[in-house]
């Protein structure tokens, strides 16, 4: 990807270290952003790490490294403490870097070697409502897809819908025996599912007939297939309404797609001597795991593992995936570890780098318990999104009493959905987080509203000056400390993208945008813009903030507004 300040400085330090100490064969510099301004812009900790290898004092190592680093682009290079090297870039270097950054921001950051990336996310089950658990998978997966595409990768967004299995035999049987039931919408279908499930649990004969219908469905029985397609279509329409609200683009490729490949998966695993019979089921055992991966049940039926293996192989062989990412809750971590081990053993994955399970934690209520209704059921996602929009309307009425009901109605959906997405994405994905409308709709703090307020502030500057588009052709001229801090923050955008891609964690992006917004607010406070002798140069910084905020918010799946 675009060379970042961090990667550029790393290359300088690597060359300097190898020049100073040619006896070192391989070396990867340890450069970090400085945590405090008096430590400069970046800090190098290599001298301490090399002390034992080189049998030298860290400060002497640091001095030798510094002697081999070109000084022209720095205001200062200081050795501090036991041997930390603190780097501060010159204003001239930052000015030149801003011009390059501006061009790349307009044309797009691009990786040198684009990959085919398949991201499997959301994945609700047919005949069931999407609930709050699907929220995390959907928006984390969407964010990662946006970021991978932003840097030039070819991204496939797949919805591995649960559209096959015993539940369909149960539903089909119930519909055949209760033809008066109306299933014109998902709400009725969900009620129907509960009725069918209750009968399946209580009535042994109904259970047998349901299992017979599963076999009939698998065999392609016309009447069973017709009902199955009807059930799927109703659910998919309801799912699409939610995807429209969340601005999610995703391609359906459900479990049923892989049905034709399941027998050959079992045969292939047997041919490769990977199958062990355990309690009449076909399993794959792996060293280091206490349980096996069951790939065929004792009754001869297939399961999730069989389908997931078929999907893994198809995505590599047919989709040409260089990278496969599956976004589900952390509770499925062991399943995907076993799946990866089996796929590697079978040759379905070329290497361990090909597959990543992106796990996430729970959404909790204010008491720290799993977020559910009072009756203990999962909260329906559609109801949660509707509530977010209503809460955003109330927030706007409180903070913007002067705007019309029409304006409130047009802005509230954007503010409400932005707030929900940002609150989720700003939490480390593996952590649980407490869901709070009150916190996520605040104008202060690490919220979507806080970012949007800065973006809207820039739109206000443009309106007051009668400017439609801010000029990115100006020449930057950093003078004040808050200008320098803002310039440095802008130039760190590619670093945030790098971290997000490396660890598959969107919170690096939200942390960056929050930091950038704080630096912009300090700049806005300290540096007079409109009518000042530095108006042109400062509007240039505003233009870069505007574009960076818009780009960053888009990567999170958030929308911008010109007014709040």
From Swiss-Prot:
Protein name: Arginine--tRNA ligase
NCBIfam families the UniProt entry points to: argS (TIGR00456)
Any GO MF annotation of the entry: ATP binding
Pfam families attached to this UniProt entry: Arg_tRNA_synt_N (PF03485), DALR_1 (PF05746), tRNA-synt_1d (PF00750)
Recorded superkingdom: Bacteria
Family: Belongs to the class-I aminoacyl-tRNA synthetase family.
UniProt subunit comment: Monomer.
Organism of provenance: Chlamydia caviae (strain ATCC VR-813 / DSM 19441 / 03DC25 / GPIC) (Chlamydophila caviae)
Membrane spanning stretches: none
GO cellular component, one term: cytoplasm
Primary subcellular site in the record, as a coarse category: cytoplasm
Motif ('HIGH' region): 124-134
Keyword NAD: no
One example of a Gene Ontology biological process annotation: arginyl-tRNA aminoacylation
Enzyme class: ligase
EC number: 6.1.1.19
Keywords: Aminoacyl-tRNA synthetase, ATP-binding, Cytoplasm, Ligase, Nucleotide-binding, Protein biosynthesis
Recorded catalytic activity of this chain's protein: tRNA(Arg) + L-arginine + ATP = L-arginyl-tRNA(Arg) + AMP + diphosphate
InterPro entries the record matches: aa-tRNA-synth_I_CS, Arg-tRNA-ligase, Arg-tRNA-synth_N, Arg-tRNA-synth_N_sf, ArgRS_core, DALR_anticod-bd, Rossmann-like_a/b/a_fold, tRNAsynth_Ia_anticodon-bd
Compartments it resides in: Cytoplasm
